[in-house]
Amino acid sequence: MTDVIIIGAGPAGLNAALYAARKELSVQVVSTDIGGQMLLTGEIENYLGLPHISGFELADKMEAHVKEYPVDFVFAGVLSTEKDSEGHFLVHLDDGKVLTGRTLIVTAGKRSRTLDIPGEMEYTGRGVSY
């Protein structure tokens, strides 16, 4: 059983993982990627201390920082969550696995609504941003 299961690996999820791991709690982060919406951002200019950085670079730096601690990354989608009779959280994954944890933090973030126009996907992060 894991102390903390975190759904989402964007800035909030990675920060939660860092804080929990530094307190010597066992941590699992469940996501389909590391970085979330940052990965689709060409340039970030409002992150304190890093005035000009690409979303990919910032996600990479955050990932490296978190990986200095024993955090288990689980690359899967989440189908559902529930609480069992003992108060533990069950996280059902799209690969059929079920994770069990004492605490659940949901930082699923969001995905932008796309316009579905020609060139949108190929230029996302390179001129097209949301």
What label would you give each PLM region?
Residues 14-18, 64, 106:
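A broad detector of short, well-ordered amphipathic alpha-helices
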Residues 1-5, 35, 73-130:
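FAD-binding core/adjacent interface of flavoenzyme oxidoreductases
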Residues 24-26, 70, 125:
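A generic structural signal for alpha->beta connector loops
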Residues 39-98:
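N-terminal Rossmann-like dinucleotide/flavin-binding domain of flavoprotein oxidoreductases
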Residues 26-39:
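N-terminal glycine-rich anion-binding loops that anchor highly charged ligand groups
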Residues 20-21, 42-45, 118-122:
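Short, glycine/charged-enriched secondary-structure capping and boundary segments
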Residues 3-28:
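N-terminal Rossmann-like FAD-binding beta1-loop-alpha1 element of flavoenzymes
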